Amino acid sequence: MIPQEKSAAVTRGLNETFGVTEFEDIRDLTERPGSNRAFRIIVRGSAYLLRINTRPGDMTRHFTCMQAAADAGLAPRVRYASAEERISITDFVEAVPLLAPDALVRIPSALRTLHALPSFPGAPFNTTCTFLLNKGPALDGFLQKFRASSILPENETEELLARYQQVAAVYSRLDSDLAPGHNDLFKPDNILFDGNRLWLVDWEAAFQNDRYADLAVVANMIVTNESEEWIYLQEYFGEPPDEYQRARFYLMRQLAHMFYAVAFLTLGSSGKPIDRSEPVPVYSDFQRRFWAREVSLADNQAKTVYGRVHWEQLSQNMRQARFDEALRIVSDRNAIQKGTRTLLPSVP
């Protein structure tokens, strides 16, 4: 079950960590072909997670961030980690369902602790919604490819890109909002609850990022109205959020919708126009099922549905008064800070 080429390295890890050369039991938890390998192993009667990273790239940042999170009580205890061998052994979390009302308090509390840690290393590539704020050839190519693909009708694509330009024009990258980020919390499987404590797992995408990125992607799964938003943000900030914090949070939630709509529509459709005849699930219902692990994004059809769900929700949000109000609030704060008002691009 262990890849043959990693057998010796796993044996060394077991020996260094537990003084044994084999485990008592093993269960393969690998999600799908091409994924990092994951196994539940039993050693001396206790369960651990053995992870073998198969994706290319330096593991140093991943393991550094994972260890920092574990030291802070946010991630399971790290028993063994070898960046050279790309292997880690951590405590295994026997997860139970975390209901959304409980998550509204537990998750922002955990994120507050995470974002207060010493700075994380940078990453070679941004795989989060803040990628849309990184001007340069990579972003230009990403957007040009989407526009040229005609995945969505031209008028819808242009509306999305126009609104995106408005957000990008006013959403300044503030040093005060940069914080250690997990950056992969749109996947519910990376948020585990053992019945007593919350654990954040899989730190492969961790790096220093805008604090609102983590907050937004989780909120897009579990925050369904303004009352829940207040609970969520008050738990994070430790006090009622002001209008500027709520505006930045709201705009980041829209950036997340944009990012996942474009990314997953592109992945799921292989860059071709999508079939619009199939009905789209109601956003809140879909995210409720996604949060409950009832929906998998493994195949292209599921990816397309996920992208469409985000696009439909974004389409509704773009026409709400709060969208323009959030743009105004953030733009006005920029004017105070810079001494001049940021002009918003107009929507055609």
Question: How does the language model describe each region?
Answer:
Residues 1-81, 86, 169, 174-179, ...:
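Conserved NTP-binding catalytic cores of kinases and kinase-like/nucleotidyltransferase enzymes
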